Regions:
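Catalytic phosphate/metal-binding cores of nucleic-acid and nucleotide-processing enzymes, i.e., regions
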Residues: 1-98
C-alpha cells in the first residue's frame, strides 16, 4: 500500500525541482489579506504564482476570487495538485526561457 500524497509532499517536490532548475522560489503571504497563493517562482523575466493542493482538491472560493483578480492584473497563477503538474510547470518554464 502506498502512502497518500499530501499537499506538503507536492510543495517539497516543487521546491526541489525549482532549485534544480536554478529558479528562485519563495513562500508567500499577504499582510492583512487572505487567499495568497502558496509560492512565487521567479526566473529570467518570468514570474509564476503557484497554488498547491492535495491531489483532487480544488481552491476555495476566496482563493479563486483572488486568482481571478491577480490574472486581471496580468499575473500568471497556476494551481497544481500533483507531481506531474510540477513537472509540467517546470518544463513550460524551461521552454519559455529559450
Amino acid at each position: 500500500m502506498t502512502a497518500k500524497l499530501r499537499e506538503s509532499d507536492i510543495e517539497g517536490y516543487l521546491i526541489n525541482q525549482c532549485k534544480k532548475a536554478g529558479y528562485l522560489i519563495r513562500k508567500t503571504q499577504w499582510v492583512g489579506h487572505n487567499h495568497c497563493p502558496d509560492r512565487l517562482i521567479m526566473t529570467a523575466g518570468l514570474t509564476v504564482w503557484v497554488e498547491l493542493k492535495a491531489p483532487g482538491k480544488k481552491p476555495r472560493s476566496g482563493q479563486l476570487r483572488e486568482h481571478a483578480r491577480m490574472r486581471l492584473a496580468g499575473q500568471r497563477v497556476d494551481v497544481i495538485d500533483s507531481l506531474a503538474g510540477v513537472d509540467q510547470l517546470i518544463a513550460e518554464l524551461q521552454g519559455e526561457q529559450k
